[in-house]
Amino acid sequence: MTAHLKKAELHCHIEGATPPELALRQARKYSVDTSAIIRDKAYVWEDFTSFVRCYDSVASLFRTQGDYALLAETYLTELAEAGTIYSEIIVSPDHGNTIGLGADAYLEGLAAGMEAAKAKTGIESRMLITGIRHLGPESVAKTAEYAAMRRHPLVTGFNLAGEERMHSVAEFARAFDIVRDAGLGLTIHAGELSGAFSVRDALDHVRPARISHGVRAIEDADLVKRLAEEGVVLEVCPGSNVSLQVFADFASHPLRPLYEAGVRVTLNSDDPPFFHTSLAQEYEVAAHVMGFSDSDIDRMTKTAIEAAFVDEPTRERLLAALHV
């Protein structure tokens, strides 16, 4: 069991963290039929395209600041109960605008939930604003401008998510320059649905501190060596990768070879209930399926805190908390 281990997470999409039970309550609140996306208290999808449709349907059940406060507090409290001391959630102001709530109110609702969870459990958390790749470079640049301007104390990073196979990384370089100049931490989805080349392109054109996923770097030995030498941190999500059939099973997942090659890796849950996982389950799989020792896993957690987009006093407190 890994229940005794402190945990930290750098990669979770907040709408994708919605427990099915909460989605059902929200559906009743707004009189929405969820029979096509939730059956037997589990989300229903078959492939990446239907997963995105299901995800969007669940996200549409959150419509007010209070809804988003509830979502953030629910997820972070669940994490804290599993021994998690730090969490970064990926958030989309574009979604706040799309539903008519507005980006500012969307962020404020999430922030209220984060603060409530911290007051209740002590868990520290931050938000990473994400651009949506398949909406195109201009849309992502506008999101980057918003992130740079907003200056919310809990917004500390920027990500690029969405359909990895649309648009080249180079087309988003301007967006990342905007947020880099604003002092935000940088990470980008790459090396998940697209191959090793997408990780290399991200390193060349975006120069991020971290890569969201990045696991298909394993297809290129020189790239793996580069990741290790440059100290780029991978936000690895094994349960997600297996559910989406990026890899057939945990036995063929490259977390261990990446770790043994000296790449800095961390454990994450991505969209946990959609993939029948949780951060606690990812730690269990690492220990009992992939064979990592407690000290190996502690090292991954320490890496997550070292790579977290937080101020240095907060980082020092979190590192100290690992050994309490």
UniProtKB/Swiss-Prot annotation:
Gene3D superfamilies: Metal-dependent hydrolases
Active site residues per record: E192 (proton donor)
Residues engaged in binding Zn(2+): H11, H13, H189, D270
Disulfide bonds: none
Keywords: Hydrolase, Metal-binding, Nucleotide metabolism, Zinc
Matching SUPFAM superfamilies: Metallo-dependent hydrolases
Record-level Gene Ontology MF annotations: adenine deaminase activity; zinc ion binding
Catalytic activity from the UniProt record: adenine + H2O + H(+) = hypoxanthine + NH4(+)
Residues making up the signal peptide according to the UniProt record: none
Family affiliation: Belongs to the metallo-dependent hydrolases superfamily. Adenosine and AMP deaminases family. Adenine deaminase type 2 subfamily.
Full protein name: Adenine deaminase
